[in-house]
Amino acid sequence: MQSVPDSQNAGSISHAQCPSGLRRRLIAAAAAVTFSGLAVFGPAFAAAEAPLIGVVQLVDHEALNDSVRGITDGLKARGLAGSLDLQNAHGDQSTLKTIGDRFVHKDAKLIFAVATPAVQAMARATKTTPIVGAAVTSYTAAKVIASNEHPGGNVTGVSNIGPVAAQLDLFMKLVPNAKRVGTIYNAGEINSVVQIELLRAAAEQRGIELEEATVTNLTDLQSAVVSMSKKVDGFVFPTDNVVVAGMAVVLRTTVPAHQVTVSGDMGSLAAGCTAAMTVDYYKLGLQAAQLGADILEGRTTAAETPIGVQDVKNPTFNVTAMKRLGLEIPEDLKAGALLWQKK
């Protein structure tokens, strides 16, 4: 077992601390590099000549913030962060459209779209500007590419598809006698639908009853978790933007009920979930930045750049949550387990 180092775990910052502060730091960093364009691009370029790069995220939560941080850091490493336009739709579809129109009007040379609705909105806004997605579960299900191997248009990116079956297996390791598992998601997000379909199949194969509830906002989420907590032995939460953004609401019910919660993102683990099987969203951002930089430098095109993925093998445990529930890490998971603890 090993502790999750701070450099690998932006999740060491809780939801209550992260979003606004991180957003301010990102904006400050973007402003700093914008005014230092000569230093970034060398004496042959003026700051105004740095290629405009648009970055849009769907909503403020830790997983998406981590991806944006990875994108900005990755672009800086490639000397391409001279003119970033960082935008947040705050979960509003009409705002996504406005942001897409903004990027097109400002003649952005590259667009990064973080989360499935964001990449869909950017794909509707332009068929020519290269778009690189991050924190997108299925680009084919989102109908923005032809195939993962040969995207074929102006969209490519990296997938955040996590090991959904392994998330359920992790839950069963912690609650071996569980008969019914709960999950909550927004049916309006195709990324969530894809993951829930995988979770259903995994539950059926393992003889576990899956209790589902769909939500569209935090009010729905609170009602759903209060009702469902009385019927299930615990929860598995593959990544859903409404649920992740409202994890504090979920935990206000599950923690007093002493229920195990397994998440698909580190932000939810930091908020108080028991354990997680998750991709590294910061590294997703770094991967996306490399794809985008290669496209911007003319090394490849979005059409011919395959969708990137991450291989997730090891679970992460919230030390405090495990102790609160009186749980020990299963022996067969100890060797590769990562431990997270708020500092």
Positions of PLM-derived features:
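Short hydrophobic alpha-helices and adjacent helix-cap/hinge residues
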Residues: Q2-V4, C18-L22, I27-A31, F35-K343
